Amino acid sequence: MKKFDKSIAAFEEAQDLMPGGVNSPVRAFKSVGMNPLFMERGKGSKVYDIDGNEYIDYVLSWGPLIHGHANDRVVEALKAVAERGTSFGAPTEIENKLAKLVIERVPSIEIVRMVNSGTEATMSALRLARGYTGRNKILKFIGCYHGHGDSLLIKAGSGVATLGLPDSPGVPEGVAKNTITVAYNDLESVKYAFEQFGDDIACVIVEPVAGNMGVVPPQPGFLEGLREVTEQNGALLIFDEVMTGFRVAYNCGQGYYGVTPDLTCLGKVIGGGLPVGAYGGKAEIMRQVAPSGPIYQAGTLSGNPLAMAAGYETLVQLTPESYVEFERKAEMLEAGLRKAAEKHGIPHHINRAGSMIGIFFTDEPVINYDAAKSSNLQFFAAYYREMVEQGVFLPPSQFEGLFLSTAHSDADIEATIAAAEIAMSKLKA
């Protein structure tokens, strides 16, 4: 049995200092019935907690660390920037370098604005969509999480789902009434919503792969249908690629599925582990953002040199060949997890998109939030705790997916499959 004495003591202290002892709810590990692990360091595919336990890491800071922990090139870039100055409140050339890479690789982006978080990116994109169209309502999908902006915390997934809360108190009714929600992968409901409210729908915002109800890919024709419906009704299509951006493919989710939105939100990978976000799209739309247009958005640390340098060094190491290797590794892990579950007769459904994998303990195919909620949460919690004992660090929520990095080796994946085999053999009874 692993020892967690130091983590337990640190969490006891933290609960007097921060709400729930953490700075983001899912880190409290409530849904898996254990105290959170306090991490001390990471290198490559491994993390180490303050009690000295080693884990193969599939959280990767919730997705950003696509090259694993403490990537040598990213670390050297950060050292060089820190020695010259961390922020100036003025433009720097590294902003141009990262912006060029983003524009080159993301089909929908002709102009990009850097911000400080994924939430900031989605909030800013919604304001832009409303300002550009002159309309008020937005359409989002049940269980899709787009950050903690008020208008987006309506039937959200991810942390809200993990806590078992339908919505967040504090969201005004006046805000909520302008948010239309329909089931993910249900194109007919989208069409009906446009029949009812089409003249006032500014945009549809969607994760190309719903990553905050587990991992739920789009059904064939769903994204194409959204593109068609929005174009027919004069609304903008926004892809929230904070999670999928540069994660599922070299050209992001939109390249993976061949559907180009009007606006795209990015985060996670483009910051290489530092706080970052971005939104971009057609030049005609983006030129409406201040100072070139009237739609205001600003940020004290937007485009700061540390985040830009980490993001640039992260992206330049990603090539089309990187994603071929991601597919191979992810297929290997997916097949191993499925074989272990089948061997022990455990109800399961596995979804995958690129290097994102979701395992649901249910017999039901998971194509939307209702199906994801059919998972056996008690079994997941027990499975999670046993995987920790086996030295594997997974996201502590049924409604979050696993992430792979370039640092994960075949040996890591084989060890993870072996750990899952042990965990499932213990739990099958």
UniProtKB/Swiss-Prot annotation:
Q: Note the InterPro entries from the entry.
A: 4pyrrol_synth_GluAld_NH2Trfase, Aminotrans_3, Aminotrans_3_PPA_site, PyrdxlP-dep_Trfase, PyrdxlP-dep_Trfase_major, PyrdxlP-dep_Trfase_small
Can the keyword Chaperone be found in this entry's annotation?
Answer: no
* Chief location bin: cytoplasm
* Molecular function as annotated in GO: glutamate-1-semialdehyde 2,1-aminomutase activity; pyridoxal phosphate binding; transaminase activity
Cellular component GO terms held in the UniProt record:
cytoplasm
Enumerate the catalysed reactions. (S)-4-amino-5-oxopentanoate = 5-aminolevulinate
Name the top EC class. isomerase
Residue positions where N6-(pyridoxal phosphate)lysine is found in the record: 268
* Pfam families, per the entry: Aminotran_3
Domain of life from the UniProt record: Bacteria
**Swiss-Prot/TrEMBL cofactor(s):** pyridoxal 5'-phosphate
Its EC number(s): 5.4.3.8
Q: Which UniProt keywords apply?
A: Cytoplasm, Isomerase, Porphyrin biosynthesis, Pyridoxal phosphate
Q: What pathway annotation does it carry?
A: Porphyrin-containing compound metabolism; protoporphyrin-IX biosynthesis; 5-aminolevulinate from L-glutamyl-tRNA(Glu): step 2/2
Q: By its UniProt entry, which PROSITE patterns does this protein fall under?
A: AA_TRANSFER_CLASS_3
Which GO terms fall under biological process for this protein? protoporphyrinogen IX biosynthetic process
Q: Where in the cell is it found?
A: Cytoplasm
Tell me, how does this one assemble? Homodimer.
Which family does the record assign? Belongs to the class-III pyridoxal-phosphate-dependent aminotransferase family. HemL subfamily.
Protein name as it appears in the record: Glutamate-1-semialdehyde 2,1-aminomutase 2
Give the classification, highest ranks: Bacteria, Bacillati, Bacillota, Bacilli, Bacillales
Q: Which gene encodes it?
A: hemL2
